[in-house]
Structure formats: C-alpha cells, structure tokens
From Swiss-Prot:
Pfam families: DUF150_C, RimP_N
Protein name as it appears in the record: Ribosome maturation factor RimP
PANTHER family according to UniProt: RIBOSOME MATURATION FACTOR RIMP (PTHR33867:SF1)
Protein family per UniProt: Belongs to the RimP family.
Length: 201
C-alpha cells in the first residue's frame, strides 16, 4: 500500500460520479464535506426500509471515525433541509467506505496497489467489461491488473484506462484487512501527535 500526503489528494476529483438525483445530492453535499476536511466517496438514494440516503465519506488520510460520521451528518442535514432535493421522507446514513471500499479516485489505485480489486468498464477491453485481479501498477491514465482468473487465450495482465472505468471495489482479503488496520493505526498516531503539538502551542 502506498502512502499519499493530504496535499496530494485533498482536491482530487472522483473518477466515478453519480447521475440524476444522486448527482444533485453530491453537488449539494460535497462542498460541505470539503469545508470540514472530508472527501466524498459516494452518495446513493436507496429504497430499502423506506428511503435511505447513503453518504460515504472519509478524511483526506483515508480514515473515518464514528465521531466523524456524526460531524458530517450534523453538517449536511441543515443544508439538505434548505435545498430540499428529495420530495419524500428519508433516513440519512453517513458511513466510512469500509475496508472493501469503492475505488473512486486515481489515488485509491495508487494507495491500494498490490491488493485485489473487481471492476467494470463502460467499453470492451480485451473482449470483456468485468475484471478481477491485483493492482500491479497505477499511473495518471489508468491502472494495470494481474488477473487471478483468466480464460484460455487471455493475457494475465490488462491495462484499464481510468476514462473507461464505470465501477471498482476492493475485494476483502486477509492482506487488505492487515494493511487497512495498519494504515488506520498510523493515521490515529499521527492525529494524536498533532493534537499534542497543538496543545503545547
């Protein structure tokens, strides 16, 4: 897993964005999140248990605590009440992207290089639109997967342009859990050190 500084990914646009009502919701929510120091991962309006607006967000370092979810919820609720983009009652659910997270930015592919991902493309690449494999390289224009399941005659590696990506998600493995926990522990230690430095000033 690669480390990125906050400055590298703070304003990085998402590769995969919403459409329709979800896009309108993202347009309302994202500026509020950015002002608080968070990044929007995804917004989805779902019709389960009534209507639920699911907002996935994270700090620039990739972390998201329960307190962060509460802070985001308290900040976006009044804005959503004023804008009133949904014409029915709904439940607001704010969460972290989780360990098996959606991959929505170029930096996600850099950060999680070496891990398994499943993805879909909007166009055929090597005669298919669905892929699964380990991210072996990520650049400015796309990423390379080493496929773990190939059919006869297919190449082991495939390069997918970011412009063709329509969906991508990490696959839960023991290595992913280990690296995610390690990254979370490091981020918490850095935050604690920052808080100590702020207290001394």
């Amino acid at each position: 897993m690669s480390d990125l500084t906050n400055a590298d990914n703070e304003r990085e646009p998402r590769l995969i964005t919403e459409t329709g009502l979800d896009q309108r919701l993202a347009d309302i929510i994202e500026p509020v999140l950015v002002d608080l120091g968070f990044r929007l991962i995804r917004v989805r309006m779902m019709n389960q248990n009534g209507a639920t607006m699911q907002v996935m967000a994270e700090r620039n370092d990739g972390t998201m605590t329960v307190q962060d979810c509460e802070e985001v919820s308290m900040a976006i609720s009044p804005v959503l009440d004023v804008e009133d983009p949904v014409d029915k009652e709904y439940h607001l659910e704010v969460s972290s992207p989780g360990i098996d997270r959606p991959m929505v930015r170029k930096s996600d592919f850099v950060r999680w290089q070496g891990h398994l991902v499943k993805c879909e493309t909007s166009i055929l690449i090597d005669n298919r639109k669905r892929f699964r494999g380990k991210i072996v390289e990520a650049g400015t224009d796309g990423f390379t997967l080493e496929r773990d399941q190939i059919a006869y005659g297919e190449e082991q590696k495939v390069t997918i342009p970011f412009t063709a990506l329509s969906d991508a998600k990490l696959i839960l493995t023991d290595d992913l859990i280990r690296d995610a926990l390690r990254a979370d522990k490091l981020a918490k230690a850095q935050a604690a050190n920052q808080n100590e430095a702020d207290d001394e000033e």
